[in-house]
Structures are given as structure tokens and as C-alpha cells.
């Protein structure tokens, strides 16, 4: 495992972080984590050098906004001495905060759920410019100062889902350990993007990358045109390796989180992380990413990462699964609902009443109502 320094904190973190948003589950319910398998995976990662584990209040909840099962799982998985071997990160659920007092309530509950007396990196979850202004006015900076002073957290940070212009403003507002951004070879100009990443690095602020595989989409099912571009490279790599090496090539990236849901994901990511050197890609290899980007963007319909923030839909539409089917159909140029996975979607696009609630919650800013119409027309329901 290779290690990098987290911003200006002096803390050495593994290039690969274990994200606990997409743990293996038993059945179809997000809250039913497969404890034995997920524990085996996280222990294997730690034994092979991973020293950073990321979770959040909402992860593995039945519906977004509810307390999920990821934090309790992590607390149990890191018991019996494993906690001391990692840097633990979780997040303040700013989306449901109403008062300054709520911040202490949530942090204290998270410490209990995680079975620990402190959190190494405590993030404000999912900031946009508007959300930042709101929580700042609620007193979040005073809260973070107090939590650092009393030892409940070591370093403050934030995750970001806003517009590019808001990222530097937030970076400059406080003494952050890092900003966590969505970044991969498809999202170089999306949200904070490469410009935001490099701005943070210039300021001595670390960068943690989420969605380096774009919710798994860059690991499997690449369009044939995109795969053909990578196949021209002198050095042959798997799709996940191309994706992760792009992220790790940036010197300003402190670590990349991967939400691993199977042991084979852990094994492959550990292998790739052993070669995670900055500035290690050749100019020719970097040029291939631009070609792949064009090939993929010419096909997909919705830049959805399946984060689940749009759920539950009041009308019962399974929005991430609907969009996944739409994209699969577009990528393979086939409207066969079986091939795209649409036959397994119970809450189809035709249930949409165009209330717009999903679009208000979507971190990607997708025109979900229009996409539901398109999907219903394509698949007939």
C-alpha cells in the first residue's frame, strides 16, 4: 500500500480508502448489510494497508434522511482492536439539521453508533453553496471548534455536491483538513472538478475523492468504443485500473474512496493501489481519457451515480434503477428491457407524477422528470 499526506494535517493515509456506502447486503434492502462478508472485506483491506474508513449517518438506510445501518456496522467491524488501526471518518447530516444543538446531538449519537470516543475526520455532509450558508449561520464553525477542543473530533472536513464557484469559497472559509469531491475521468469539469481539486492543493487542503469509478460504471460495461480506445494503450489495464489510476495521478489527491460491495473489488483495488503514484501516467495515456470521455458521453442519457438522495419517490418510482436501465439501453443501443435490467424494476418510470421532489434532492442536477418520460416511452411503462 502506498500512503499520502492528508493536506496539512501531517496524517499519513492509505491511497485507497474503504467507503461504506455500498456494502454487500442480504436480499434487496439496503439496510440488511451482510455482516460476515462485509466484515471480512474490511478486515482484509486493513490487513493489506488500508487505514481509512468512511461512513455516514445516511448510508445503508431504507430511505434517504433516515439513520442508516452503515455506522453501526462499522462500529462493530472495528471493535476488538481494529479501530486503533484506522482513521475513521463520518459525516454531520446537515440536510436534516434544524438548530445548533442538533449538531451535538448527532455527533454524540454517531460516537455511540461507531463505538468510539472520537472521530478522526468529521465531515459536513453534502455541501452546496446554499447549504454552506445555512449551516454556517446555524453556528457550525463554533460547533467544529468546540468538538475539536473537547476531543470528539480530530480534524474537520466537508463533502461537496455544489457548483464549481462555491468550492473555493468554502475552502477559504475555515481550517479544513480536506474537501471531499466527486472526481473521475468523466467528471473533470463537474462540480469542483480538476480546477477545484488543484485550488485546494495550492491552499494546503487535502482532497478525498468519492465516486472514482462513478458508482461502478467505469469498472464494468464500458461502451465498446470506449474500451477500444483503452485497448490501444501500450500497457494493458482493466477498466477499474484505468479509472483509479487517473484519480491517483493527481498529486493533490490524498486518497480515493471506493465503495466496495464484493471481496473481488477489494482484492483488485488493493492491487491497483500498490501502484498509485502521482504523475505516473504518460502524456499518451492521459490523451486516451479524453477520447474515452467523448465516446461515453455521446451515449449515456443520465449522469446518475445511484447515490439514492432522490429516494423515496412519493409515487414509488425507483429512480436510480430506472435511470440505470435507461443508460444501459443507451450504451448498448438496445431497448430490450431484460438486457437493460428494467424487467426487475417494480417502480417504473410511468408512475412519475412530475412533482419534482427528486430534482430538488439530486446532487447531480439531473432533469429527472424528462428522463422518466423518455424511459416510459422507451420501455412502455
Label each residue range with its predicted role:
Residues 6, 18, 45, 53, ...:
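Conserved, mostly hydrophobic/aromatic
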Residues 19, 56-59, 122-125, 159, ...:
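Conserved residues at the C-terminal ends of beta-strands
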Residues 94-210, 221-227, 234-235, 249:
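Glycine/proline-rich, positively charged
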Residues 13, 53, 85-86, 116-119, ...:
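Local beta-strand N-terminus motif with an aromatic residue
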Residues 1-86:
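N-terminal binding-site loop/beta-alpha segment at the start of enzyme catalytic domains
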Residues 52-58, 154-158, 180-181, 255-257, ...:
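Short catalytic-loop micro-motif centered on adjacent basic/acidic residues
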Amino acid at each position: 500500500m502506498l500512503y499520502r499526506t492528508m493536506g496539512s494535517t501531517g496524517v499519513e493515509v492509505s491511497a485507497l480508502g474503504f467507503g461504506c456506502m455500498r456494502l454487500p447486503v442480504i436480499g434487496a434492502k439496503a439496510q440488511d448489510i451482510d455482516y460476515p462478508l462485509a466484515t471480512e472485506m474490511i478486515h482484509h483491506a486493513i490487513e493489506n494497508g488500508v487505514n481509512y474508513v468512511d461512513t455516514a449517518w445516511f448510508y445503508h438506510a431504507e430511505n434517504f434522511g433516515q439513520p442508516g445501518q452503515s455506522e453501526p456496522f462499522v462500529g462493530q467491524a472495528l471493535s476488538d482492536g481494529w479501530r486503533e488501526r484506522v482513521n475513521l471518518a463520518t459525516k454531520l447530516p446537515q440536510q436534516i439539521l434544524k438548530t445548533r444543538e442538533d449538531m451535538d446531538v448527532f455527533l454524540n449519537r454517531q460516537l455511540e453508533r461507531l463505538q468510539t470516543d472520537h472521530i478522526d475526520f468529521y465531515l459536513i455532509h453534502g455541501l452546496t453553496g446554499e447549504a454552506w450558508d445555512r449551516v454556517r449561520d446555524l453556528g457550525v464553525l463554533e460547533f467544529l471548534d468546540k468538538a475539536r477542543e473537547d476531543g470528539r473530533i480530530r480534524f474537520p472536513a466537508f463533502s461537496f455536491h455544489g457548483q464549481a464557484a462555491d468550492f473555493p469559497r468554502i475552502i477559504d472559509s475555515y481550517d479544513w483538513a480536506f474537501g471531499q469531491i466527486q472526481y473521475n475521468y468523466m467528471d473533470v469539469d463537474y462540480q469542483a472538478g480538476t480546477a477545484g481539486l488543484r485550488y485546494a492543493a495550492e491552499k494546503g487542503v487535502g482532497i478525498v475523492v468519492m465516486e472514482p469509478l462513478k458508482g461502478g460504471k467505469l469498472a464494468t460495461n464500458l461502451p465498446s468504443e470506449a474500451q477500444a480506445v483503452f485497448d490501444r494503450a501500450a500497457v494493458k489495464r482493466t477498466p477499474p485500473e484505468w479509472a483509479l489510476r487517473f484519480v491517483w495521478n493527481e498529486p493533490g489527491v490524498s486518497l480515493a474512496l471506493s465503495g466496495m460491495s464484493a471481496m473481488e473489488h477489494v482484492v483488485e483495488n488493493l492491487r491497483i493501489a500498490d501502484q498509485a503514484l502521482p504523475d505516473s501516467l504518460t502524456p499518451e495515456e492521459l490523451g486516451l481519457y479524453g477520447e474515452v470521455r467523448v465516446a461515453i458521453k455521446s451515449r449515456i442519457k443520465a449522469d446518475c451515480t445511484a447515490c439514492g438522495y432522490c429516494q423515496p419517490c412519493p409515487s414509488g418510482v425507483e429512480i436510480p434503477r430506472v435511470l440505470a436501465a435507461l443508460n444501459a439501453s443507451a450504451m448498448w443501443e438496445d431497448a430490450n428491457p431484460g438486457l437493460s435490467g428494467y424487467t426487475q424494476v417494480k417502480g417504473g418510470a410511468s408512475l412519475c407524477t412530475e412533482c419534482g421532489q427528486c430534482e430538488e434532492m439530486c446532487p447531480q442536477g439531473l432533469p429527472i422528470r424528462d428522463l422518466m418520460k423518455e424511459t416510459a416511452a422507451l420501455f412502455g411503462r
